[in-house]
From Swiss-Prot:
The lineage of its organism: Eukaryota, Metazoa, Chordata, Craniata, Vertebrata. Residues 787-994 are annotated as: Interaction with CREBBP. The keyword Manganese does not apply. The gene is Ncoa1. This is Nuclear receptor coactivator 1. GO terms for cellular component: chromatin; cytosol; nucleoplasm; plasma membrane; RNA polymerase II transcription regulator complex; transcription regulator complex. Keywords: Acetylation, Activator, Acyltransferase, Isopeptide bond, Methylation, Nucleus, Phosphoprotein, Repeat, Transcription, Transcription regulation, Transferase, Ubl conjugation. Interacts with PPARA; the interaction is direct. Interacts with PPARG; the interaction is direct. Interacts with ESRRG; the interaction is direct. Interacts with STAT5A (via FDL motif). Interacts with STAT5B (via FDL motif). Interacts with STAT6 (via LXXLL motif). Interacts (via LXXLL 1, 2 and 3 motifs) with RORC (via AF-2 motif). Interacts with ASXL1. Interacts with the methyltransferase CARM1. Interacts with COPS5. Interacts with the histone acetyltransferase CREBBP. Interacts with DDX5. Interacts with the histone acetyltransferase EP300. Interacts with ESR1. Interacts with GCCR. The keyword Repeat applies. Nuclear receptor coactivator that directly binds nuclear receptors and stimulates the transcriptional activities in a hormone-dependent fashion. Involved in the coactivation of different nuclear receptors, such as for steroids (PGR, GR and ER), retinoids (RXRs), thyroid hormone (TRs) and prostanoids (PPARs). Also involved in coactivation mediated by STAT3, STAT5A, STAT5B and STAT6 transcription factors. Displays histone acetyltransferase activity toward H3 and H4; the relevance of such activity remains however unclear. Sumoylated; sumoylation increases its interaction with PGR and prolongs its retention in the nucleus. It does not prevent its ubiquitination and does not exert a clear effect on the stability of the protein. Ubiquitinated; leading to proteasome-mediated degradation. Ubiquitination and sumoylation take place at different sites. Residues 361-568 are annotated as: Interaction with STAT3. It catalyses: L-lysyl-[protein] + acetyl-CoA = N(6)-acetyl-L-lysyl-[protein] + CoA + H(+).
Length: 1447
């Protein structure tokens, strides 16, 4: 040892000896070599002895260091010595043997195996390739109960469950045998696998056990197998490839400790209502009471300077619907420190009587105190995500307070969608609103968020995602059905009105709303297309708002507040305060609207075509009846007030989607919204009256009143907000919403004060934000929405056509619309306003490009489909066109356009914002294209200001908006004063006309009898301006579409706004004749172009395409007309003004056709519409109807009113030249197209083709100067072969064909229709625009066998000239000349164009007057005429002419 140690201690010794000895002595070297070998051998033995695990040494590729071995040997010797000493004391033999230096290892192999198996907690067995157990360890008994001998040489499959055989074989056999594919290196590679298998437990050997199988029991074992491909030779036996297995019991899964949690229920103010500790009690832990106390205390304890988690979560929950807190710590009484996190969710109970509440899950984390609540998926309660539809800015308490009242409704989708789209997206883009709305703010400024939230909340109130489609934007609020307005207004909470709005999870409309099935309700739901950003926002947000807390949203006007909110929302109109008021009021309004809609929608649903007439008449009657029925009307007024703005905004969406009832609901929620709509006109007639109603409602404090007030403030707020459609405007809206929420939060009693404050505040905001012009326009449009039927055109005027012209036209139209809306109540009585309003609102719905595609498709899918694509191309123009197509391009579209244009066309917004203070300038739009483009924006601003004028009559709102002066300057009051009396007659006229149209059109399309006629009316509503209607309603295209229920929107009251517009324009003529021209151009574009122009252009014009004569000749004529377009535009604009004035004076009937939209639409159509091809497109748009009937007329059959409206509009527009030649040439090919489109499709009975051809070709072929427009009208009117044989004949052929078609479509009376139409055309020509209504009616009548009617109409106009219908045809020209002479005589003081206008006015009055007899002749018109009770045509003529002349 010592020698070895020496040598090892001196490692260099061996080498040194070697070096020293090797050179001298070989013997010495060999001896040294042997010594080294011996030394190495000893070292190896030492290493083996020292190694506790021989395998470790074997595995070493390099020999261990000698010094280490020796050192360890020394250590080991010392250890052994100590052990020997211990041995002597303990006498441990085993240890002696283990440590014996003579043993091969520290542990004997015999004892190593059992120790290893024990450590493995399993048994060991080896299976050969045949599956036989060649070896099994003895401890198998403790696992399976078998003895070692029992299992040796038995098949392993005997103890394996049959289901595990395949798995075992897979591991036992080489892969090449299992898979049939040779595996490289398989022969030399070890494969180890671990798998689970069931092994049989030894069955009991009880003699009583007969059925061994029944006693079989298997235990799942985990097998670790190693395949030994090489043969093993041991003890002379050759073990071929085998599988070495170790089986052990599966580790027992650790006991799962239940998550400790308890739940709290908080009200919408954040107070804990109840605590559920059942899970804690079930856990059996002691001290759970202390745990709950400490946890809640820590949860509500402020976090340093930060508010408590409870407050933070409450705010987040109220905003987003769900929230989770980070982990917070607390110490129990026993000193144990625990951590917990809380998850909260806003829940809406199914019962409408229950308030919304916040469920909080407090999860205790004893082990991972740092675990964030988000990480903890084991929350006792899964908190449904509530999208943050509620504006985060809204105080959660406010929102929560009313959540329980929110009824679950499928409208959640609408409301959610509306909220999304209510966001500034109205301003930005449709797609943006949806995505941004999905976010907490739904992409809208705080105000808009609130509005959207309100809409969402109201829409989703009762339904926690009960309507999955509602949760399109996945807004937590939406999902939970939370309504921001609920939170915003504690009053809502107390308000059962909302709750009563039946929180039907599947019915977006309150159960008490019978007309939920009515198109209004349906459209309301159907038109919440996410695609519509602005348009959709108004509709859905309005609906969502209405639907949520006000399940009455089923009707589009279900919650005017909501709708208004939605319309306001898009321009940030929904300021926080209005949102709060709306949330409260929306319930109330929802209930009110619900009732109204029950009555009105019942009417609407009962008679889709007639309901609007009856409902609107009823509503108008209520409105006319005044305060005696204000209880009802006040609700409806509340709706109207709340919906006017919303309808304007929504009209884009709702009108399109709710073409029938929705558009009407916009006006009257079908009839119900229209009471508001009608009220709106009446309130328009006296906005001050409407304002009084608001205050009255505030004073009464009724939920619906409050809602109305809230809606109105919201409108106002939205006006500032809409002004701030830009971010700033939205932020203002948000701030106001927050303010309102706070106020509602503080006191429900302050709701009135708050509403008043909001009204004032909105006014102030509007003043302070003149740049919010467009938003103001929206707001005003909202208010005009009451007069929305006519407002639609003004707003559409703000469509893609020249912004300035559009804006100016819009604003002027808005002023006219204000007047018209003043007349609207009467018109609504005529039940035409409702349908027009419906259409208008539907048109308004069309305003949004997205909405058009989404909303329009439902109501006017054919035309709407075209409109939607066109809208994509020409957002503004298309919207306008859609509006007109829907029959109320002027009002609904205008108003929606105010918002939609703002949102869709932000360019207009900024301009409006900048130009809001430039109302006067806006009133005078430039005539140039650039000027018109500027006018587009200016028109939007004007529309906003004119809408403000509506609110001016609501003195506070108008003052706040600074619209008082505008209204006063615009003479809305005068017009309302002048027109209200006329209203009675015009509405009757309108009613007669709808009836006439219903009958004539009923014959061609009995199914659309009312629907079709109302569709016509709806389209005629776009003819608020006579021209716009004609252009606006592509009868062919929209006839089928309008067939849904546009006819309900037959509300011709828009004509009243036309009259108002005419009067307003006449008023402004002196100061702003050029402006009026531009505005009228915009009107034509807007009404004919925007409402109908766009659709007409892409759709309607296509409809007209079927008329090759119109195309070929009109192209040439229109080219010529284009040359003289400026000149003729001025003439036509003046004529239209006169017509508008006449319509204002003499007819609410005519107004739809000769409404502002006509004026504005006519100029605008030329701008935006294709020049020559509009006619064919118009025809193309008519695909829905027989081409032979000049598809417009086919559709006119469906929408006789629309056709008439178109004709009226055409006549009104193209008094001198039926918008084709004169107006078309004067205005533009677009206008001609639109005009002709309408005349072609809509006015063909009047010789639309004739009118258009004669107008376009006649105007162009017989291109007439300013006087020729008059002649042009006359020419167009007599386009019969008698007038101008070549061009006129060609046009007449097309026109006659159209007339025949129209006769066929409307009524198989081609001959009477043609003569009647032509006679009417003559009358119309004579009347220029004035006879438009009669023309419209006469063509319709002629189709309806109205030849005599047409003759009476003509007799009215020029009865003195010619009474013979046959002569009429020929006499048309004479009549025209006589009319022209008469016109000249009447308008001697005026320019020739003005003379034509005066003539048109006179003729329009005559037409109305004559139209009365004319209408009286047909059963429907005659029936309705008594309602109108118009004076004798001549008397009316005189008074109207006097008024017009005085104007």
């Amino acid at each position: 040892m010592s020698g070895l140690g020496d040598s090892s201690s001196d490692p260099a010794n061996p080498d040194s000896h070697k070096r020293k000895g090797s050179p001298c002595d070989t013997l010495a070297s060999s001896t040294e070599k042997r010594r080294r070998e011996q030394e190495n051998k000893y070292l190896e033995e030492l290493a083996e002895l020292l190694s506790a695990n021989i395998s470790d040494i074997d595995s070493l590729s390099v020999k261990p260091d000698k010094c280490k071995i020796l050192k360890k040997t020394v250590d080991q010797i010392q250890l052994m010595k100590r052990m020997e000493q211990e041995k002597s004391t303990t006498d441990d033999d085993v240890q002696k043997s283990d440590i014996s230096s003579s043993s091969q290892g520290v542990i004997e192999k015999e004892s190593l195996g059992p120790l290893l198996l024990e450590a493995l907690d399993g048994f060991f067995f080896v299976v050969n390739c045949e599956g036989r157990i060649v070896f099994v360890s003895e401890n198998v008994t403790s696992y399976l109960g078998y003895n070692q001998e029992e299992l040796m040489n038995t098949s392993v499959y005997s103890i394996l469950h049959v289901g595990d055989h395949a798995e075992f074989v897979k591991n036992l056999l080489p892969k090449s045998l299992v898979n049939g594919v040779p595996w490289p290196q398989e022969a030399t590679r070890r494969n180890s696998h671990t798998f689970n298998c069931r092994m049989l437990i030894h069955p009991p050997e009880d003699p009583g056990t007969e059925n061994q199988e029944a006693c079989q029991r298997y235990e799942v074992m985990q097998c670790f197998t190693v395949s030994q491909p090489k043969s093993i030779q041991e003890d002379g036996e050759d073990f071929q490839s085998c599988l070495i297995c170790i089986a052990r019991r599966l580790p027992r899964p650790p006991a799962i400790t239940g998550v400790e949690s308890f739940m709290t229920k908080q009200d919408t103010t954040g107070k804990i209502i109840s605590i559920d500790t059942s899970s804690l009690r079930a856990a059996g832990r002691t001290g759970w009471e202390d745990l709950v106390r400490k946890c809640i205390y820590a949860f509500f304890q402020p976090q340093g300077r930060e508010p408590s988690y409870a407050r933070q979560l409450f705010q987040e929950v109220m905003t987003r619907g769900t929230a989770s807190s980070p982990s917070y710590r607390f110490i129990l009484n026993d000193g144990t420190m625990l951590s917990a996190h809380t998850k909260c969710k806003l829940c809406y109970p199914q019962s409408p009587d229950m308030q919304p509440f916040i469920m909080g899950i407090h999860i205790i984390d004893r082990e991972h105190s740092g675990l964030s609540p988000q990480d903890d998926s084991n929350s006792g309660m899964s908190i449904p995500r509530i999208n943050p539809s509620v504006n985060p800015g809204i105080s959660p308490a406010h929102g929560v307070t009313r959540s329980s009242t929110l009824p679950p409704s499928n409208n959640n989708m609408v409301s959610a969608r509306v909220n999304r789209q209510q966001s500034s997206d109205l301003n930005s883009s449709s797609s943006h609103t949806n995505s941004s709305n999905n976010q907490g703010n739904f992409g809208c400024s705080p105000g808009n968020q609130i509005v959207a939230n309100v809409a969402l909340n109201q829409g989703q109130a009762g339904s926690q995602s009960s309507n999955p489609s509602l949760n399109l934007n996945n807004s937590p609020m939406e999902g939970t059905g939370i309504a921001l307005s609920q939170f915003m207004s504690p009053r809502r909470q107390a308000n059962s009105g909302l709750a009563t709005r039946a929180r039907m999870s599947n019915n977006s409309f309150p159960p008490n709303i019978p007309t939920l099935s009515s198109p209004v309700g349906i459209t309301s739901g159907a038109c919440n297309n996410n695609n519509r950003s602005y348009s959709n926002i108004p509709v859905t947000s309005l609906q969502g708002m209405n639907e949520g807390p006000n399940n009455s949203v089923g009707f589009s006007a279900g919650s005017p507040v909501l709708r208004q909110m939605s319309s306001q929302n898009s321009p940030s109109r929904l300021s926080m305060q209005p949102a709060k008021a709306e949330s409260k009021d929306s319930k109330e309004i929802a209930s009110i609207l619900n009732e109204m809609i029950q009555s009105d929608n019942s009417d609407n649903s009962a008679n889709e075509g007639k309901p609007l007439d009856s409902g609107l008449l009823h509503n108008n009657d209520r409105l006319s009846e005044g305060d005696s029925k204000y209880s009802q009307t006040s609700h409806k007024l509340v709706q109207l007030l709340t919906t006017t703005a919303e309808q304007q905004l929504r009209h884009a969406d709702i009108d399109t989607s709710c073409k029938d009832v929705l558009s009407c609901t916009g006006t009257s929620s079908s009839a119900s919204s229209n009471p508001s709509g009608g009220t709106c006109p009446s309130s328009h007639s006296s906005l001050t009256e409407r304002h009084k109603i608001l205050h009255r409602l505030l004073q009464e404090g009724s939920p619906s009143d409050i809602t109305t007030l809230s809606v109105e403030p919201e409108k106002k707020d939205s006006v500032p907000a809409s002004t701030a459609v830009s971010v700033s405007g939205q932020s203002q809206g948000s701030a106001s919403i927050k303010l309102e929420l706070d106020a509602a939060k503080k006191k429900e009693s302050k709701d009135h004060q708050l509403l008043r404050y909001l009204l004032d505040k909105d006014e102030k905001d509007l003043r302070s934000t003149p740049n919010l012009c467009l938003d103001d326009v929206k707001v005003k449009v909202e208010k005009k929405e009451q007069m929305d039927p006519c407002n639609t055109n003004p707003t559409p005027m703000t469509k893609p056509a020249p912004e300035e012209v559009k804006l100016e036209s819009q604003s002027q139209f808005t002023a006219d619309l204000d007047q018209f809306d003043q007349l609207l109540p009467t018109l609504e009585k005529a039940a035409q306003l409702p349908s027009l309003c419906e259409t208008d609102r539907m048109d308004g719905a069309v305003t949004g490009v997205s909405i058009k595609a989404e909303v329009l498709p439902a109501s006017l899918q054919p035309t709407t489909a075209r409109a939607a694509p066109r809208l994509s191309r020409l957002p503004e123009l298309e919207l306008e066109a859609i509006d007109n197509q829907f029959g109320q391009p002027g009002a609904g579209d205008q108003i929606p356009w105010a918002n939609n244009t703002l949102t869709t066309i932000n360019q207009n917004k900024p301009e409006d914002q900048c130009i809001s203070s430039q109302l006067d300038e806006l009133l005078c739009p430039p005539t140039t294209v650039e000027g018109r483009n500027d006018e587009k924006a200016l028109l939007e601003q004007l529309v906003s200001f004119l809408s403000g004028k509506d609110e001016t009559e609501l003195a506070e709102l108008d003052r706040a908006l600074g619209i008082d002066k505008l209204v006063q300057g615009g003479g809305l009051d005068v017009l309302s004063e002048r027109f209200p009396p006329q209203q009675a007659t015009p509405p009757l006229m309108m009613e007669d006309r709808p009836t006439l149209y219903s009958q004539p059109y009923s014959s061609p399309s009995p199914t659309a009898g009312l629907s079709g006629p109302f569709q016509g009316m709806v389209r005629q509503k776009p003819s608020l301006g006579a021209m716009p209607v004609q252009v606006t309603p592509p009868r062919g295209t929209f006839s089928p579409n309008m067939g849904m229920q546009p006819r309900q929107t037959l509300n011709r009251p828009p004509a009243a706004p036309n009259q108002l517009r005419l009067q307003l324009q006449q008023r402004l003529q002196g100061q702003q004749q050029l402006m009026h021209q531009n505005r009228q151009a915009i009107l034509n574009q807007f009404a004919a172009n925007a409402p109908v122009g766009m659709n007409m252009r892409s759709g309607m014009q296509q409809q007209i395409t079927p008329q090759p004569p119109l195309n070929a000749q009109m192209l040439a004529q229109r080219q010529r007309e284009l040359y003289s377009q400026q000149h003729r535009q001025r003439q036509i604009i003046q004529q239209q003004r006169a017509m508008l004035m006449r319509h204002q004076s003499f007819g609410n009937n005519i107004p739809p056709s000769s409404g502002l939209p006509v004026q504005m639409g006519t100029p605008r159509l030329p701008q935006g519409a294709p020049q020559q091809f509009p006619y064919p497109p118009n025809y193309g748009t008519n695909p829905g109807t027989p081409p032979a009937s000049t598809s417009p007329f086919s559709q006119l059959a469906a929408n006789p009113e629309a056709s008439l409206a178109t004709r009226s509009s055409m006549v009104n527009r193209g008094m001198a030249g039926n918008m084709g030649g004169q107006f078309g040439a004067g205005i533009s090919p677009q206008m001609q197209q639109n005009v002709f489109q309408y005349p072609g499709p809509g006015l063909v009975p009047q010789g639309e083709a004739t009118f258009a051809p004669s107008l376009s070709p006649g105007s162009s072929m017989v291109p007439m100067p300013v006087p020729p427009p008059q002649s042009s009208l006359l020419q167009q009117t007599p386009p019969t072969s008698g007038y101008q044989s070549p061009d006129m004949k060609a046009w007449q052929q097309g026109t006659m064909g159209n007339n025949n078609v129209f006769s066929q479509a409307v009524q198989s009376q081609p001959a009477p229709a043609q003569p009647g139409v032509y006679n009417n055309m003559s009358i119309t020509v004579s009347m220029a625009g004035g006879n438009a209504n009669i023309q419209n009616m006469n063509p319709m009548m002629g189709q309806m066998q109205m030849s005599s009617l047409q003759m009476p109409g003509m007799n009215t106009v020029c009865s003195e000239q010619m009474n013979d219908p046959a002569l009429r045809h020929t006499g048309l020209y004479c009549n025209q000349l006589s009319s022209t002479d008469l016109l000249k005589t009447d308008a001697d003081g005026n320019q020739q164009v003005q003379q034509v206008q005066v003539f048109a006015d006179v003729q329009c009055t005559v037409n109305l007057v004559g139209g009365d007899p004319y209408l009286n002749q047909p059963g429907p018109l005659g029936t309705q005429k008594p309602t109108s009770g118009p004076q004798t045509p001549q008397a009316q003529q005189k008074s109207l002419l006097q008024q017009l002349l005085t104007e």
